[in-house]
Amino acid sequence: MTHPLPHDSHTSGAPPLVNKSRDLANGPPFFSPLQSLWEEFLHLLFMGTLLFYRIATKALRGKATLLKSHSKQPAQPGWEPGIRAPSPVPASSLQDHSRLTSLSRTGKEQRRTLSLIRKTSGTPTESTVATAAASTTEVPSRLPWAARAGFKRTTGVCIALPT
């Protein structure tokens, strides 16, 4: 009976064509310098990427700190409108304020407006009159929550009843 060849047998190890780790170390002479060059290239690439990442992170962290410190400063007239609003009261409320003061000349009208504000206080549907009238001489005891937060409201009802 003939003995089976090692690569034909299932009981023997791997076929002789499969490379093993010691075969790579004893490979052709050009492989070792090429492998070390490739490893050096990957190392430099990784270190360069890591250095760039650290520099970029530091720069962005500084930028975020700079922006944060700017947001804590009071608004200045030369600032861009997108960075921070110049005042907590919306511009529409300032226009309503001038209109309201011209409409409500007498004390009775002003008291009616203020009582109307007190009734609507604390709801998100109140008019812009609440913000405007709150800055007049007779300030209500409770400011509406939307006026405190500086919400911009586009719709509003201004009622001035003559006496």
Swiss-Prot record:
Ranges of Polar residues composition bias in the record: 90-105
UniProt-annotated stretches for the region Disordered: 1-21, 71-112
Protein name in the entry: Putative uncharacterized protein GSN-AS1
Organism encoding this protein: Homo sapiens
Gene that produces this protein: GSN-AS1
Highest taxon listed in the record's lineage: Eukaryota
Biased composition (Basic and acidic residues): 1-10
